[in-house]
């Protein structure tokens, strides 16, 4: 009488284990790849959101620039737009100005709709500074917000006929501002904002 086989041989078991092990290894590699891609996408998404937030701040602030000179801490008159190398202790160029359009619903808060804002390069980042006061703002500590990593900032101002490297008018604001920002993440970024000037 012939005996029939009632199971797998050792060789068949080893081949099956090898196949399942290779399938498990491939599945793990696919999972690791998807995790790495998701992490890279999330990191890039975070950087892109920060860039969009930075451009949004700049756009809202610059397009609301007011031709309003300010009074310094000692009562001295300062220009409506203060810009140049070292302004606000910037490691590159910086700028400070008064903007309007700050929301004060039903005038319930004891403040105006004006805000003094500034931008500078500090510790490798573009920073936005905001003072609640328009006059003698130096006597109040500003709120600072780190924006995108940046190592240089260059500003130019359009007076209606030509671009200038500096702005010297005490009361008037330029027609447009050109900003060239160098960021290690994004390279060179150039943007032009049309303002309310000349006024």
UniProtKB/Swiss-Prot annotation:
Subcellular location: Cell inner membrane
Keyword tags: Cell inner membrane, Cell membrane, Membrane, Methylation, Transmembrane, Transmembrane helix
Record's bilayer topology term: Single-pass membrane protein
Post-translation changes: Cleaved by prepilin peptidase. Methylated by prepilin peptidase at the amino group of the N-terminal phenylalanine once the leader sequence is cleaved by prepilin peptidase.
Modified residues (N-methylphenylalanine): 8
Residue ranges listed under propeptide: 1-7
Keyword presence, Transferase: no
Listed InterPro entries: N_methyl_site (IPR012902), Pilin-like (IPR045584), T2SS_protein-GspJ (IPR010055), T2SS_protein_J (IPR051621)
Entry's Gene Ontology BP terms: protein secretion by the type II secretion system
Source taxon at top rank: Bacteria
TM stretches of this protein: 8-27
GO cellular component, one term: plasma membrane
Its biological purpose: Component of the type II secretion system required for the energy-dependent secretion of extracellular factors such as proteases and toxins from the periplasm. Part of the pseudopilus tip complex that is critical for the recognition and binding of secretion substrates.
Complex formation: Type II secretion is composed of four main components: the outer membrane complex, the inner membrane complex, the cytoplasmic secretion ATPase and the periplasm-spanning pseudopilus. Interacts with core component GspG. Interacts with pseudopilins GspI and GspK.
Family in the record: Belongs to the GSP J family.
Protein name: Type II secretion system protein J
The organism of origin for this protein: Escherichia coli
């Amino acid at each position: 009488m012939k005996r029939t086989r009632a199971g797998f041989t050792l060789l068949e078991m080893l081949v099956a284990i090898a196949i399942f092990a290779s399938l498990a290894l491939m599945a793990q590699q696919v999972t690791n790849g998807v995790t790495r891609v998701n992490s890279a996408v999330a990191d890039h998404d975070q950087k892109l959101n920060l860039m969009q937030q930075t451009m949004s701040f700049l756009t809202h602030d610059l397009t609301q620039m007011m031709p309003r000179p300010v009074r310094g801490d000692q009562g001295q008159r300062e220009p409506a737009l203060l810009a140049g190398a070292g302004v606000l202790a910037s490691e590159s160029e910086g700028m400070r100005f008064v903007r309007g359009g700050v929301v004060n619903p039903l005038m319930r808060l004891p403040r105006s709709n004006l805000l003094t804002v500034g931008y500078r390069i500090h510790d490798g980042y573009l920073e936005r500074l905001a003072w609640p006061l328009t006059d003698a703002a130096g006597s109040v500590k500003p709120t600072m917000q780190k924006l995108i990593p940046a190592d240089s900032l260059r500003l130019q101002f359009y007076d209606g006929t030509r671009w200038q490297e500096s702005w010297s008018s005490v009361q008037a604001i330029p027609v447009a501002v050109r900003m060239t920002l160098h960021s290690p993440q994004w390279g060179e970024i150039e943007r032009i904002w049309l303002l309310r000037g000349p006024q």
